[in-house]
Amino acid sequence: MKRTYQPSKRRRSSEHGFLKRMGTANGRKIISRRRRHGRKQLTRV
């Protein structure tokens, strides 16, 4: 059986990246919430 996590940089950025977040209203909410909270890393990419 294959393991569930098969890492890929391209897939990671296209699904969780900064540009993807900024592309939707809810994504922008996430970014602003993380900024307010003082996160060093806004997205995981």
Curated annotation (Swiss-Prot):
Could you tell me where the Basic residues compositional bias lies? 1-13, 30-45
One cellular component GO annotation, for this chain's record? ribonucleoprotein complex
Q: Where is this region: Disordered?
A: 1-45
Position of the signal peptide: none
Q: Which PROSITE patterns match?
A: RIBOSOMAL_L34 (PS00784)
Q: Name one GO biological process term.
A: translation
GO MF annotation: an example: structural constituent of ribosome
Q: Which UniProt keywords apply?
A: Ribonucleoprotein, Ribosomal protein
| Protein family (similarity comment) | Belongs to the bacterial ribosomal protein bL34 family.
The protein here is known as Large ribosomal subunit protein bL34
Per UniProt, what is the name of the gene that codes for the protein in this document?
A: rpmH
